[in-house]
Amino acid sequence: MKTRAQVFRVQFNNVLIRLDMLLNNEIDALWLTEPQATKARILGNPMLRDSRDFKVALGVLALRTAGVSDARRKAQLAAFVKGYNRACDSLNQRGLQAYADVIARRCKADKATLQALPKLYYSHIAPPRQQDIAAAAHAFKD
């Protein structure tokens, strides 16, 4: 859908700054990660779209071939993948509430936000799907 309104694509890498801008009416709409998206909803901001509805996985772990060419680097990568996948399993089995203290400390989330977090599923590291590659390529055509 096209709009006549003037739209600017800006990038703010700090999610806490993005949330503050929304809460202070300095920005009209933006993508938020959890737990910031939950905080925005609690404070009455409407959710226009939920990225989980898109059925696309755009998270990426990208490495240079030269960066994993020797045995030591391959072992480091294998250990990283194993640790990441175990963390996903733990989050999926125990839920975010089991890590509420870490989320509160690292993400500056309050108790109400922590209690309202949605049930999320975390995927293991896997090669990109063709549909995700196509979606990423399409996004950069604009």
Predicted regions and their residues:
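Solvent-exposed loop/turn segments at secondary-structure junctions
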Residues: L16, P35-T38, R52-V56, G67-V68
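A bilobed periplasmic-binding-protein/Venus flytrap-type ligand-binding module shared by bacterial periplasmic
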Residues: L58-A75
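Secondary-structure end/capping motifs
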Residues: A71-D142
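Short helix-initiation/N-cap motifs at beta->coil->alpha
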Residues: T3-N24, P35
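Short beta-strand->loop
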Residues: F8-V10, L43-G59
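Ligand-binding cleft/hinge of the Venus flytrap
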Residues: M1-Q11, R41-I42, A100-I103
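A ligand-binding cleft/hinge motif common to bilobed small-molecule-binding domains
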Residues: D28-N45
